[in-house]
Amino acid sequence: MIGIIDYGMGNLRSVEKALKYVGYDAKITSDAKEIKNFEALILPGVGAFPDAIRVLIKTGMAEEIKIHIEKGKPFLGICLGMQLLFEKSFEGGKTEGLKIFKGNVVGLPKGNKIPHVGWNSLTIKKDTPFLKGIKNGDYVYFVHSYYVNGNEKDFEYAVTEYGIEIPAVIIKDNVFSCQFHPEKSGETGLKILKNFGEMIKCL
């Protein structure tokens, strides 16, 4: 069973529906005590970093997420859920994150329309089962005003261009993350969620 973490933000039902469509059972939870029961976790998200991390800490879910990851269980962060994995964000000031990955979350540079909303193509940098069946130039759906400016270049598996190169997929051990929304990315996104489900059996 895959747990979808509910902290008051994100496309929870869309993620749940997409997972079920590709054949995986999922349950939405806001109960920190329940997190340990899941084989894998997904942290989706649309919203402000400071608000999100505040809720995760207050509810005890932040600590349970860290325990889940430390145990080697599969974890997927989507959009804001990816950004929350980093050390800190400069959205609305400076806020510490979950510190799973090294680096910061910063605002997209001026020049292009902000927020970055819509379809953009992926450039695949490394092979991974997470991106099985995904090709260079495949389009996925983005909605964000901030991006990861991190120190995890060795773990970048795909990027996109929006005035600058933006990390689109970062994978480190059992932790998977994507800046785009697979649940909104049509057949390409469904393939990625199916791949994540298949990898749960292998990790």
Swiss-Prot record:
GO terms for biological process: L-histidine biosynthetic process. InterPro entries: Class_I_gatase-like, GATASE, Imidazole-glycPsynth_HisH. Its main location: cytoplasm. This is Imidazole glycerol phosphate synthase subunit HisH. It comes from the Bacteria. The active site is at 79 (nucleophile), 181, 183. GO terms for cellular component: cytoplasm. Keywords: Amino-acid biosynthesis, Cytoplasm, Glutamine amidotransferase, Histidine biosynthesis, Hydrolase, Lyase. Signal peptide: none annotated. Heterodimer of HisH and HisF. SUPFAM superfamilies: Class I glutamine amidotransferase-like. It is found in: Cytoplasm. PANTHER family: IMIDAZOLE GLYCEROL PHOSPHATE SYNTHASE SUBUNIT HISH. IGPS catalyzes the conversion of PRFAR and glutamine to IGP, AICAR and glutamate. The HisH subunit catalyzes the hydrolysis of glutamine to glutamate and ammonia as part of the synthesis of IGP and AICAR. The resulting ammonia molecule is channeled to the active site of HisF. Residues 1-203 form the Glutamine amidotransferase type-1 domain. It catalyses: 5-[(5-phospho-1-deoxy-D-ribulos-1-ylimino)methylamino]-1-(5-phospho-beta-D-ribosyl)imidazole-4-carboxamide + L-glutamine = D-erythro-1-(imidazol-4-yl)glycerol 3-phosphate + 5-amino-1-(5-phospho-beta-D-ribosyl)imidazole-4-carboxamide + L-glutamate + H(+); L-glutamine + H2O = L-glutamate + NH4(+). It holds the Pfam family GATase. Its EC number is 4.3.2.10, 3.5.1.2. Pathway: Amino-acid biosynthesis; L-histidine biosynthesis; L-histidine from 5-phospho-alpha-D-ribose 1-diphosphate: step 5/9. One of its GO terms (molecular function) is glutaminase activity. The lineage of its organism: Bacteria, Bacillati, Bacillota, Clostridia, Thermoanaerobacterales.
